[in-house]
A protein has these predicted regions:
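Extended amphipathic alpha-helical interaction segments
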Residues: 103, 116-118
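Substrate-binding/active-site groove segments that recognize
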Residues: 120-143, 154-163, 181-182, 200-203
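Surface-exposed patches in mature extracellular/periplasmic domains of secreted proteins
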Residues: 100-108, 146, 168-176, 215-216
Length: 233
């Protein structure tokens, strides 16, 4: 049968899409102090945090799928992922349509960043579903970070930029999303911050769950995903 997806158009007055010709300032992210080894040291003992490691994504996914420690990452529940899709799935699809970032990957980031809470603000000032700091929101054309459509569009655009900037490496892209791309560049890989070293495997493990909500399971974070609950026909 023919598959159709109903995606609502962007409302008049919404923040514009980011200018692809604008080069973000990689020094804009704040410095964070170096921290001791994270609770996810078991993950990094197998997966190299350094820049330029081929095959890292496959290695990370295999390790997360097999290691018993994965269950200790305090992952979102599958029911939470489903609820986010029901509430914001159309905005996620609209923001990832035609991009190199899977809707399931964006879903995983939302689940870890905010648990689907639209108006949450972190202690560091990150805002909304994808926890955009004000400077990042401005970079990617987000006028109202508490508007779900704008926030998701900005976060998805930032993920896409990070994937391109780090040559399609999801591990470095996630590290950049959490710590800032400048921190990744300065560290020569995933910075040795507890928060970042825990964040990367947590999002990747959540991605393994999120892709189960797609009509066809994506293998790569760049593969397309249509959420089963939004498919008709």
């Amino acid at each position: 049968p023919r598959i159709t997806i109903q995606i609502e158009p962007r409302e008049p007055g919404a923040a514009p899409y980011p200018d692809p010709n604008r080069v973000p300032d990689v020094t804009a992210e704040p410095e964070r102090p170096l921290e001791p080894d994270s609770a996810a040291a078991w993950f990094w003992s197998v997966v190299s945090p350094q820049i330029g490691v081929p095959g890292r994504y496959d290695q990370a996914i295999a390790h997360l799928s097999e290691a018993p420690q994965t269950r200790d990452l305090r992952l979102p529940r599958f029911e939470d992922l489903t609820a986010i899709v029901q509430a914001h799935g159309r905005e996620i699809l609209a923001s990832t349509a035609g991009s190199d970032v899977s809707a399931a990957f964006v879903l995983a980031v939302i689940a870890v960043e905010s648990a689907g809470r639209v108006e949450v603000v972190s202690h560091a000032g990150a805002q909304g579903l994808m926890q955009l700091i004000p400077a990042t929101a401005e970079r990617f054309g987000v006028g109202d970070p508490f508007d779900p459509g704008q926030n998701i569009a900005g976060g998805a655009a930032y993920l896409s930029w990070l994937m391109e900037n780090f040559n399609g490496d999801p591990v470095l892209a996630l590290a950049g999303y959490n710590a800032g791309e400048g921190a990744v560049a300065r560290a020569g890989g995933v910075p040795n911050y507890d928060e970042t070293r825990d964040y990367v495997p947590k999002v990747l493990a959540t991605w393994l769950m999120a892709r189960q909500l797609c009509t066809r399971r994506p293998d790569l974070v760049s593969d397309p995903c249509l959420f089963t609950t939004l498919v008709s026909g």
